[in-house]
């Protein structure tokens, strides 16, 4: 086992496969103006991680909105991402951005998309203007209620060709993550326990794997099972202020 905790690797989960399938459908759309798609779900399911990894792999433009966004601010962020001169009035900046985006058909990803809906969705309307003219794909990432919020803006909602809801990770997803990311072998029972304790929250899974690795390293274990982690907290439930602990089933191992 190496000195570094947990391998740095991208795990292609069921949510990833649904997302990629939806992107392909939007790219092959019939109506050029219907070039937007929405990704939503509760926190911790890997929305930002999956889509940002896809963006890095495909050359898409990845932006993260914030509560201060205005149409001009959005254009400035887009210019910075493309390393384009962001000076001048909004009209000239819009034109400078439109040309390369249209020519290269770069998708635009906007994380924390709720913030684009302020002031009658003024910032998102500006992005929509670009998408309408460039005929490129725009991917919005938001929380569970964003779908209903966007419905209030017909000019935007009518352009959303696909909606992808991210769901809790499956047992197969967790098994893949444990096998690909951990530098120690885990028993099937332990991977099932991690799935149960995490409730399919991939963020929790990623927090638990290093704990398993530390126990394995401290106790020189080639393969870790449920009994090796009995009573050991793998994470912490901050809402209930209680540790998330492997079920008791035998002797405890030492924790580094």
Where do the language-model regions lie?
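A short helix-turn-beta junction within AAA+ P-loop NTPase domains corresponding to the substrate/partner-engaging
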Residues: 59-60, 151-168
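C-terminal alpha-helical "lid" subdomain
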Residues: 2-21, 44, 48-53, 172, ...
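Short, well-ordered alpha-helices that flank and scaffold nucleotide-derived cofactor binding pockets
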Residues: 52-56, 80, 129
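Pre-Walker A (Motif I) flank of P-loop NTPase domains
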Residues: 30-37, 59
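Mid-core helix/loop region of P-loop NTP-binding domains shared across ATPases and GTPases
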Residues: 70, 76, 85-137, 149, ...
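A structured, charge-rich N-terminal accessory region that forms the first stable segment of a protein
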Residues: 3, 25-30
């Amino acid at each position: 086992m190496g000195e570094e905790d947990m391998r740095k690797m991208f795990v292609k989960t069921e949510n990833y496969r649904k997302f990629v399938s939806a992107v392909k459908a939007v790219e092959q759309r019939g109506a050029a103006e219907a070039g937007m798609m929405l990704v939503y779900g509760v926190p911790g399911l890997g929305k930002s991680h999956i889509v940002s990894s896809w963006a890095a792999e495909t050359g898409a433009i990845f932006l993260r909105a914030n509560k201060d966004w205005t149409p001009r601010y959005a254009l400035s962020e887009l210019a910075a991402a493309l390393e384009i001169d962001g000076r001048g009035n909004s009209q000239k900046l819009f034109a400078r951005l439109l040309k390369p985006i249209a020519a290269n058909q770069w998708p635009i990803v906007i994380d924390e998309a709720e913030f684009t809906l302020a002031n009658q969705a003024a910032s998102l309307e500006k992005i929509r203007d670009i998408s309408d003219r460039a005929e490129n794909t725009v991917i919005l990432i938001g929380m569970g209620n964003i779908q209903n919020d966007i419905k209030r803006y017909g000019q935007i909602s009518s352009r959303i060709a696909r909606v992808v809801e991210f769901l809790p990770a499956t047992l197969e997803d967790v098994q893949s993550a444990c096998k690909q990311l951990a530098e120690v072998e885990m028993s099937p029972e332990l991977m099932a326990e991690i799935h149960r304790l995490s409730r399919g929250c991939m963020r929790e899974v990623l927090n638990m794997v290093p704990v398993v690795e530390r126990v394995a390293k401290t106790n020189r274990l080639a393969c870790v099972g449920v009994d090796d982690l009995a009573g050991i907290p793998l994470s912490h439930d901050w809402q209930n202020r209680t540790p998330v602990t492997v079920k008791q089933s035998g002797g405890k191992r030492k924790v580094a």
